Amino acid sequence: YVTRGVTTLALFFMLFAVEAAVRLNIKTAAEGEAVKQQLLKAADINAAVQAQTPSFIKEHYRQLSGMTNAYVCGVGANLGTASEGALKFGETVSIPTAAYEVEEYIHGPNIQMTPRYSVFLIDGGEGTERIHRIFEGTKIVTDNAFLLTRCADYKDEHNVMYVPMD
């Protein structure tokens, strides 16, 4: 599923917030323009992710089609990404999926894991290194641990979707 309406609404709210911040002198015009450039970059990254997704699915088809349940974990702003990811798994492949902030995940949900569980970890910001350590630990329990990352150190690893953001 591609939900352009939600994406468009989110972009509208972000642009509205930038414009309001500039008009209320919370941000300078230059700061507002810098945020707008980041939003443009985000759109390019989104296109890159969409371009990579079919090959990732093809490479991991057996694992993905055999999922019976999943966790999707993020940190910082990517907690929202994790929540949306969990929702999409429920909508598209009809499996129970929970979204967690990564620290929540390691304080309970990971304890009940078995090798049949699927776990998707999304890095970003200050929590990137922590997510990477948790990814390594999760791989001890299940072969179905996946990492979505912008860290080039992981780009050739199994079960990793590397998204360059330069």
Residue ranges and their predicted role:
Residues 1-166:
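A SIS-like phosphosugar-recognition module
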